[in-house]
């Protein structure tokens, strides 16, 4: 039987499949027979009799009957100018994944990590495109890492490989990480189809409706400001949920050449941003130990449950105390001598010290609504020691010191007047701080309510 006769014979079996011609030509390459198209095949096929007939038959059966992915049969896949070896047990590289590389801002990056690297597609392509980068690839599957190392040699690039589970790999990188790029498992069970049956399930499916890995990465980013950029692949069917998860970060969507959504680029050089109405989300970040930068009725302030965190951010004397903000419903928790004054002076720009602790109920309806959710919390002006707070939130996003802090920004339509509150010490009966205008107002309120200073 010559090659032409084999083609006709197999076309009778599988010719109803619209991909038969292309698959046949591709599989011939595995056996050293290369034809540009069917015309070239027909021109020479009748004269070719020395070939592995049974091998070609078995390969066609593996594809059309057993539905084994073509790259597993051929043993390799070509993506642009790069060639990747493939084998069962390791996720097959996809050309669309390379669309993630077009958003890499490599000019300011030195070290990049490809998490869940599989056969090394993104790590190798990244190193090939940006040779100056120090690139790591990590995966939990030792078989995948062995194949990735082969692919790196095949494509003549140097990548360092780490066997570790997702974020655990980052602890094994000894230099500051600037870029994380990842195509982790993101499908749920309902999204699997028969064409994926032969690929490793743990490379495809994630718990938590497919976003488990992204939730872990979200939590990691909240406390790791040194990572400048994160690039993620995800399913188009998860776009809405995916964008919602990372909505507090500055992001841009990534699309393939076919204009299909494939992932997201996160600019982690900017602080996360929430609106003041997102009270539950704000409390969740505060509970994680983050500090809010938020406009108050006086100045742009810092809010945190931890005084030590405020000391660290402000770089100030740890022996000083901070004002505690509270909601109206919490006034009855105050010392008795302050409860009466609270009803007369609050909400307003008056801070009272009693028993060595400072309290204030701010004059901002939006802020009071937030305080009802977050509870009693420490607040201070958003500045370093011996410096003044900025007048605009945007200034914090553009300041190299502040964007490195474990902070997030809360947008509030209420504008601060850039004047600190008056402070009155009930323990010593003394005014600790206040402008001349504030003193006049304070004295007027004392007189109105027939109170003695």
UniProtKB/Swiss-Prot annotation:
GO function term, MF aspect, one: S-adenosylmethionine-dependent methyltransferase activity
Domain YrdC-like: 276-437
InterPro entries listed in its UniProt record: DHBP_synth_RibB-like_a/b_dom, DNA_methylase_N6_adenine_CS, N5-glutamine_MTase, SAM-dependent_MTases_sf, Small_mtfrase_dom, Sua5-like_dom
Cysteines engaged in disulfide bonds, as pairs: none
Organism in which the protein naturally occurs: Mycoplasma pneumoniae (strain ATCC 29342 / M129 / Subtype 1)
GO biological process annotation, one example: methylation
Record-given protein name: Uncharacterized protein MG259 homolog
């Amino acid at each position: 039987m010559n090659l032409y006769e084999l083609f006709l014979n197999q076309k009778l079996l599988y010719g109803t499949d619209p991909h038969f011609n292309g698959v046949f030509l591709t599989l011939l390459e595995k056996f050293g027979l290369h034809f540009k198209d069917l015309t070239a095949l027909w021109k020479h096929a009748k004269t070719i009799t020395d070939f592995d007939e049974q091998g070609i038959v078995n390969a066609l059966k593996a594809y059309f009957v057993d539905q084994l992915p073509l790259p597993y049969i051929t043993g390799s896949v070509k993506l642009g100018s790069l060639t990747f070896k493939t084998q069962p047990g390791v996720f097959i590289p996809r050309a669309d994944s390379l669309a993630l590389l077009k958003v890499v801002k490599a000019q300011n990056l030195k070290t990049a990590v490809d998490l869940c690297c599989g056969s090394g597609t993104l790590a190798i392509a990244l190193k090939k495109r940006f040779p100056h980068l120090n690139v790591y690839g990590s995966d939990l599957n030792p078989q995948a890492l062995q194949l990735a190392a082969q692919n790196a040699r095949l494509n003549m690039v140097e990548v360092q490989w780490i066997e570790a589970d997702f974020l655990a790999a980052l602890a094994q990188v000894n230099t500051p990480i600037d870029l994380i790029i990842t195509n982790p498992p993101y499908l749920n069970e309902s999204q699997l189809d028969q064409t994926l049956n032969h690929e490793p399930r743990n490379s495809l499916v994630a718990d938590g409706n497919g976003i488990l890995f992204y939730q872990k990465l979200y939590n990691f980013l909240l406390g790791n400001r040194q990572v400048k950029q994160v690039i993620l692949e995800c399913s188009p069917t998860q776009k809405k949920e995916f964008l919602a998860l990372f909505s507090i970060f500055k992001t841009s969507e990534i699309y393939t050449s076919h204009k299909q959504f494939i992932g997201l680029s996160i600019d982690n050089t900017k602080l996360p941003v929430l609106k003041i109405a997102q009270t539950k989300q704000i409390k969740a970040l505060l509970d994680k130990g983050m500090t809010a930068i938020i406009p108050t009725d006086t100045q742009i302030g810092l809010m945190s449950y931890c005084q030590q965190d405020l000391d660290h951010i402000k770089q100030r004397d740890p022996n000083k105390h901070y004002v505690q903000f509270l909601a109206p419903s919490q006034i009855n928790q105050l010392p008795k001598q302050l409860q009466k004054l609270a009803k007369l002076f609050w909400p307003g720009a008056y801070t009272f010290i009693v028993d060595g602790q400072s309290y204030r109920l701010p004059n901002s309806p939006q802020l009071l609504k937030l305080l009802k959710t977050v509870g009693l919390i420490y607040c201070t002006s958003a500045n370093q020691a011996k410096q003044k707070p900025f007048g605009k939130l945007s200034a914090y996003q553009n300041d190299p010191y502040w964007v490195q802090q474990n902070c997030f920004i809360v947008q509030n339509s209420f504008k601060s007047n850039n004047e600190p509150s008056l402070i009155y010490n009930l323990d010593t009966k003394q005014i600790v701080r206040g402008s001349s205008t504030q003193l006049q107002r304070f004295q007027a309120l004392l007189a109105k309510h027939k109170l003695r200073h």
